[in-house]
């Protein structure tokens, strides 16, 4: 009975607090070495969760970088994290230690969404045989269906024509271009995966685009961070279904499309699309428990392609049009180069890119300035590594701050301004920058980079060949500030598209 009186309750409370503090202290033992990266002192149990602004992580990390240096530490709950900033340190991690930092940390919320040891897709997969198998398949199949070849270029050019038709239908009006751009890029991915496209007013396409956006919103921000930090919360009945409702609905929609594709698949015929090619591999892998070719992983690979291949490029183009209406002189100079190299009748082709240094520089500067994936996806150390004279232990989550590279004051002349001359020499020739890495670097660099580069060039040049874009009369000048999520998109804005006349 003494346990239930005031003295007993106080004793139990004190014992519990001491026990938690001892456990917390043991979880901090990685900090006991003098060569562990410095950082703010974490709170017991919570770590640094309340010391960073999750709604604007890049700015929080920018301030911490200036206080603690290019390599510093944080703690998420009891999980150690190291933030890597600026070109030299980032290259050291992604390239010099590429093999040792190619893994992904465990992410509890993704287990609720169907990620399992043999069904991790490509982007979230642990670094190992399954990841190699799926990356090799994805790259090979994308090449088969035209990545870097004329066939895919024709698909993209045709879709760019449909996009231009959609803009023409609303020429002279005040519109938000985001929805149309998302639909166009969704159709490119749907062509690769299912060999089909949708009309822009098709309710199925509209719903698909909406669900992709919702699913990305659901896995970024404060709530997912809390759930990943304290995964026991995911055991609360019904919580995961409520928090990730859009993601689960999107997967159900994809399941219907995959089932539809399967009913018309003929194994005796050459594959029509990526889904057919994957199903053929599933048949070959039957009886092999070590293979990652299974129906569950097909779904995860398709989710990867839609989320990474659609929204990222559409968001970059949304930034591009925003910057064109804010910098009309840049827009006119791009149009002048288009007129000189391509003209106003012929469709742009990838072979034109080599003869269009200014347009190429503008596209690269849009990617640098837009900075749509500032923190990339986290990495995980598979062994102890040494970076910038610091020792980072095995099992540490690495956050690669690409924003600190793309906007490094020691590299770029005007890091926080839109300045296409960053990619031009004194003679006006296009120049590459080693600090330009919007697709990351190393072993886990974006596998869809060639496709994204093709889409950006063809869509951007097609649009500026056909239209002049401006801020609508009576509308305020849009902001160049982005909204931190994945991907980082500009704040909603309106533009007016006017069909260009010959010679204008």
From Swiss-Prot:
Organism whose genome encodes this protein: Rattus norvegicus (Rat)
Pfam family, one: p450
Binding site for heme: 446
Protein name in the entry: Cytochrome P450 2D1
Any one biological process term the GO annotation gives: arachidonate metabolic process
Cofactor annotation: heme
Record has Disulfide bond as a keyword: no
Reactions that this protein is recorded to catalyse: an organic molecule + reduced [NADPH--hemoprotein reductase] + O2 = an alcohol + oxidized [NADPH--hemoprotein reductase] + H2O + H(+)
Family: Belongs to the cytochrome P450 family.
Any GO molecular function: monooxygenase activity
Enzyme class: oxidoreductase
Keywords assigned: Endoplasmic reticulum, Heme, Iron, Membrane, Metal-binding, Microsome, Monooxygenase, Oxidoreductase
């Amino acid at each position: 009975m003494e346990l239930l009186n005031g003295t007993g309750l106080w004793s139990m409370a004190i014992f519990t607090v001491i026990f938690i503090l001892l456990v917390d202290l043991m979880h901090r033992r990685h900090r006991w070495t003098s060569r562990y990266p410095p950082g703010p002192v974490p709170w017991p149990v919570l770590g640094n969760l309340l010391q960073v602004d999750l709604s604007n992580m890049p700015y929080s990390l920018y301030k911490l970088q200036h206080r603690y240096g290019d390599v510093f530490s944080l703690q998420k709950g009891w999980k150690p994290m190291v933030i890597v900033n600026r070109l030299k340190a980032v290259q050291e991690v992604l390239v010099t230690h590429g093999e040792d930092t190619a893994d992904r940390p465990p992410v509890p919320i993704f287990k609720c969404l169907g990620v399992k040891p043999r069904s991790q897709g490509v982007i979230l997969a642990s670094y190992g045989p399954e990841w190699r198998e799926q990356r090799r398949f994805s790259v090979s199949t994308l090449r088969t269906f035209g990545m870097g070849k004329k066939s895919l270029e024709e698909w993209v050019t045709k879709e760019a024509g449909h996009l231009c038709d959609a803009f023409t239908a609303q020429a002279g009006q005040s519109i938000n271009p985001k929805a149309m751009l998302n639909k166009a890029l969704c159709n490119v991915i749907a062509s690769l995966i299912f060999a089909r496209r949708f009309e822009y007013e098709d309710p199925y396409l509209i719903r698909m685009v909406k669900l992709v956006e919702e699913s990305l919103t659901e896995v970024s921000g404060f709530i997912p961070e809390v759930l990943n930090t304290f995964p026991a919360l995911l055991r609360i009945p019904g919580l995961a279904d409520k928090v990730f409702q859009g993601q689960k609905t999107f997967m159900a929609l994809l399941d219907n499309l995959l089932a539809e594709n399967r009913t018309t698949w003929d194994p005796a015929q050459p594959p029509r699309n990526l889904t057919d090619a994957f199903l053929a591999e599933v048949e070959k892998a039957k009886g092999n428990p070590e293979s990652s070719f299974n129906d569950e992983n097909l779904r995860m690979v398709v989710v990867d392609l839609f989320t990474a291949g659609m929204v990222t490029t559409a968001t970059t183009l949304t930034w591009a049009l925003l910057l064109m209406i804010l910098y009309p002189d840049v827009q006119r100079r791009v149009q002048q180069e288009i007129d000189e190299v391509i003209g106003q009748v012929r469709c742009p082709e990838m072979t034109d890119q080599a003869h269009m240094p200014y347009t190429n520089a503008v596209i690269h500067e849009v990617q640098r300035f837009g900075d749509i994936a500032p923190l990339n996806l986290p990495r995980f150390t598979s062994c102890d590594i040494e970076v910038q004279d610091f020792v980072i232990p095995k099992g540490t989550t690495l956050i690669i701050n690409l924003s600190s590279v793309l906007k490094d004051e020691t590299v770029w002349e005007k890091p926080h301004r839109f300045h296409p001359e960053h990619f031009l020499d004194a003679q006006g020739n296009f120049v590459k920058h080693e600090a330009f890495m919007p697709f990351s670097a190393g072993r886990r660099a974006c596998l869809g980079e060639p496709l994204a580069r093709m889409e950006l060039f063809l869509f951007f040049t097609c649009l500026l060949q056909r239209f002049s874009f401006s801020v609508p009369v009576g509308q305020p000048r849009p902001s160049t500030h982005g909204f931190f999520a994945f991907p980082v998109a500009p704040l909603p804005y309106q533009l007016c598209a006017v069909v260009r006349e010959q010679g204008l």
